[in-house]
């Protein structure tokens, strides 16, 4: 066995989370020695891959499940506002890197694509109108447009209006400042940027086989998948950012904070169209409402995707079930994750989520014709020969202890960290990649509290002139920061002079 290497930071998984955290830490302390270890032979091979990622550029502009109606019919926009400001924080980091000049062009990973919400029927229209009235009063959504006019709708979403019944009651809202983000390209751009920094290694085809306490830090055992050799790395801090594999790695650590967590894997499928004659008629991300009783992951949307400069359309998601935690994982992932500490929450979730189980089974059993029927609700003239089924990435939803129910299924992400801040893991799924930077900032503040208050404070303020809370309330600051980010990311033509955020 090779002699132990010593580093400051080990990051497990070469996806968007680890890549973001690694680059951010090197900006804050260029002297840090860090290593990224990844099982696959490239970065962004799982959920960060553009064909695996369920939704991109989430900014709360069009996702109707972020603005649920209350019992009295009013709309709560808090979650949409929060996700919007989190996305603006992500844009601040990308803009900071783009301005450096050594990072490369932002056009390789972010493109302007309008975000639309689309509803059908009287109830849908009533909901969307109320939502529009509530959201357009907030500065983050002040440019939102609403229409029920068929001619206007035909301009906004021509593919979706052709062949539709003239008397069908429909409505839509539009935000022109939406984006499509290729998180695979962004991840690899971050990793390339990282690999040029001193004291930084990215090791592919490497499997973490052990994680044990060593003094104030950790010893990470890593097996070379190709050669079979094993080495040990001593690290002061370990981040488990391995997507669905983060849960078993967290369990391997044995930290008290990991007890009681379980995972519920959900796979996804998409219909994909690359026919340029179809694709050219749809330049938008259009989200609608999930069917009554369906989980939030089932919100249907028809998206323009830009990957490597080529446009495609994706429609879905169609959910599925497998016991794998990663697309390239093992069918034993779920059974091997069962522990004494999490079996009660997992059984409680199984008991209380029979509707979800039935939904997943029904999705798995769908024929191609049934999937096309769902698509034709959006695109009435869809032809079977233009679309093919693609398997998306794995999402592992969080199961956690609950005092009343025994266990609950949680949709979203959760940061789990050791009490001493020496180890952290990211569990869960949506909104995921779009709010990566906010999540990694939370991790840094939680695991390195002293440094964020002292030696890292000025650099953090330079990179992030405005954080989420102030962006939620200060309209002028929001406008200024957002405009400068958009210019740096080449989303709009440059108009404003560079100015202080003070």
From Swiss-Prot:
GO terms for biological process: tricarboxylic acid cycle. Pathway: Carbohydrate metabolism; tricarboxylic acid cycle; oxaloacetate from (S)-malate (quinone route): step 1/1. GO terms for molecular function: 2-hydroxyglutarate dehydrogenase activity; L-malate dehydrogenase (quinone) activity. Coiled coil: none annotated. It is an enzyme of class 1 (oxidoreductase). It comes from the Bacteria. The keyword Flavoprotein applies. Belongs to the MQO family. It catalyses: (S)-malate + a quinone = a quinol + oxaloacetate. This is Probable malate:quinone oxidoreductase. Its cofactor is FAD. Its EC number is 1.1.5.4. The keyword Oxidoreductase applies. Keywords: FAD, Flavoprotein, Oxidoreductase, Tricarboxylic acid cycle. InterPro entries: FAD/NAD-bd_sf (IPR036188), MQO (IPR006231).
């Amino acid at each position: 066995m090779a002699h132990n290497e010593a580093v400051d930071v080990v990051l497990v998984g070469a996806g968007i989370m680890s890549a973001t955290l690694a680059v951010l830490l090197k900006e804050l302390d260029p002297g840090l020695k860090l290593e990224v270890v990844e099982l696959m032979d490239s970065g962004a091979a799982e959920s960060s891959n553009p064909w695996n990622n369920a939704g991109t550029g989430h900014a709360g502009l069009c996702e109707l499940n972020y603005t649920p109606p209350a019992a009295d019919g009013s709309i709560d926009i808090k979650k949409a506002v929060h996700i919007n400001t989190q996305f603006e924080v992500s844009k601040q980091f990308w803009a900071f890197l783009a301005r450096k000049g050594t990072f490369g062009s932002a056009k390789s990973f972010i493109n302007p694509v309008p975000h639309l919400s689309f509803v059908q029927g009287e109830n849908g229209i009533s909901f969307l109108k109320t939502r529009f009235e509530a959201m357009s009063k907030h500065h983050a959504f002040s440019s939102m447009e609403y229409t029920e006019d068929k001619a206007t709708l035909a301009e906004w979403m021509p593919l979706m209006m052709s062949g539709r019944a003239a008397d069908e009651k429909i409505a839509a809202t539009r935000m022109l400042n939406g984006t499509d983000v290729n998180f695979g390209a962004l991840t690899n751009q971050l990793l390339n940027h990282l690999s040029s920094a001193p004291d930084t290694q990215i090791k592919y085809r490497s499997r973490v086989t052990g994680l044990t306490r060593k003094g104030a830090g950790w010893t990470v055992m890593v097996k070379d998948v190709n050669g079979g050799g094993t080495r040990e790395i001593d690290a002061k801090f370990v981040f488990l950012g391995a997507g669905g594999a983060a849960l078993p790695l967290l369990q391997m650590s044995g930290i008290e904070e990991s007890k009681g967590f379980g995972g519920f894997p959900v796979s996804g499928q998409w219909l994909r169209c690359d026919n340029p004659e179809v694709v050219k008629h749809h330049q938008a991300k259009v989200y609608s409402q999930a069917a009554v009783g369906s989980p939030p992951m089932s919100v249907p949307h028809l998206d323009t995707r830009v990957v490597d400069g080529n446009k495609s359309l994706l429609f879905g998601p169609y959910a599925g079930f497998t016991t794998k935690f990663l697309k390239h994982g093992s069918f034993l992932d779920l059974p091997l994750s069962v522990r004494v500490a999490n079996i009660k929450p997992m059984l409680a979730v199984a008991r209380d989520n029979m509707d979800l189980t039935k939904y997943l089974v029904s999705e798995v059993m769908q024929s191609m014709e049934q999937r096309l029927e769902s698509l034709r609700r959006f695109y009435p003239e869809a032809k079977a020969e233009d679309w093919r089924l693609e398997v998306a990435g794995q999402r592992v939803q969080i199961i956690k202890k609950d005092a009343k129910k025994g266990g609950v299924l949680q949709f979203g992400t959760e940061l789990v960290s050791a009490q001493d801040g020496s180890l952290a893991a990211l569990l869960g799924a949506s909104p995921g990649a779009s709010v990566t930077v906010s999540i990694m900032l939370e991790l840094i503040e939680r695991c390195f509290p002293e440094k964020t208050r002292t030696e890292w404070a000025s650099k953090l303020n330079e990179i992030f002139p405005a954080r989420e809370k102030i962006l939620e309330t200060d309209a002028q600051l929001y406008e200024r920061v957002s405009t400068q980010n958009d210019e740096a990311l080449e989303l709009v033509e440059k108009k404003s002079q560079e100015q202080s955020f003070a």
